[in-house]
């Protein structure tokens, strides 16, 4: 009862002081803003007792209403700077701003004290996703580079000894045969693109190979379902569901069962990236890209156009490079095209953001869309113009 009275009193005072509400400083360039995270600075001279009372009331918001997003993370009391940081929804941050004890509020951001890495010998695709404008020749990324994140690669298998993977690839499961190898090369190429030392987006992420397609690059939907299910169970058993990416650079006609399997991975807390397909048709007719919560990725070209082969439609989250992409093959580097590789870029950026921003899997696709740049010039009228961007600030 005391907590209810305390919160009610705080809200009443907030409403009375709305005229003198603290300023919520503009975020400006939002590339490095941490979603729903704020730094709250208190007015000069506020007593320790008043500060403690305020933070106690803030902590009580969540206890009284589970729908309220309010989580106080850190407090600080430096010489002339007293305040705290936390995660708050829009309504709550407005209530906090209305407290006369608050001086100003600003968005929390990613600090780059660790520095950015600039890869000089990068392919056009890596350069493109780390720069807002075309023509760059380097890949710019934070050196966290997906560290601590695993990518469950549901595909043709992976040559785990490929030098570009730097020993960070392991076998997970095989639903095709008794041969733990990649007889096609598709999976190895994707592993290199997602996490390779030279060709990769998230250069410190781990790859887990789940084989559901044979040496011809084909397999049953039942294999695909088994592969996704294995990823979900493995992540749960190892406590890494929110640090797991599932890459689905495969698919075909609509399947409710395949979509449900992909949706289960999303509900388990994972970020799932899926290729929309390369039949130049509406992607809502394909699975698993049409599954709810899955990040459906279309393919773009070097000149920021939608690839002519790429599927399209309202389910597309973003475009990503998918034409003339170089990565590791079975016999050295090869160049390939397809929406499979667009999805691989998104999986890499997903792993990168999970490591860098410490966000949850269900936030990754939204964050990818927030960072993306609207530059695709010829996308169909019912399809986004957004192009994948890692938020490097370049």
UniProtKB/Swiss-Prot annotation:
Record bears the keyword Mitochondrion: no
Residues forming the catalytic site: 155 (charge relay system), 186 (charge relay system), 340 (charge relay system)
EC code(s) of this entry: 3.4.21.-
Signal peptide: 1-21
InterPro entries named in the record: PCSK9_ProteinaseK-like, Peptidase_S8/S53_dom, Peptidase_S8/S53_dom_sf, Peptidase_S8_Asp-AS, Peptidase_S8_subtilisin-like, Peptidase_S8_subtilisin-rel, S8pro/Inhibitor_I9, S8pro/Inhibitor_I9_sf
Glycosylation, residue list: 216, 247, 382, 390
Source domain of life: Eukaryota
Pfam families hit by this protein: Inhibitor_I9, Peptidase_S8
MF (Gene Ontology): serine-type endopeptidase activity
Statement: the UniProt record of this protein carries the keyword Hydrolase: yes
Ranges for domain Inhibitor I9: 37-110
Primary location group: secreted
Record keywords: Glycoprotein, Hydrolase, Protease, Secreted, Serine protease, Signal, Virulence, Zymogen
Residue span(s) of the pro-peptide: 22-114
Family designation: Belongs to the peptidase S8 family.
Protein name: Subtilisin-like protease CPC735_005570
Organism per entry: Coccidioides posadasii (strain C735) (Valley fever fungus)
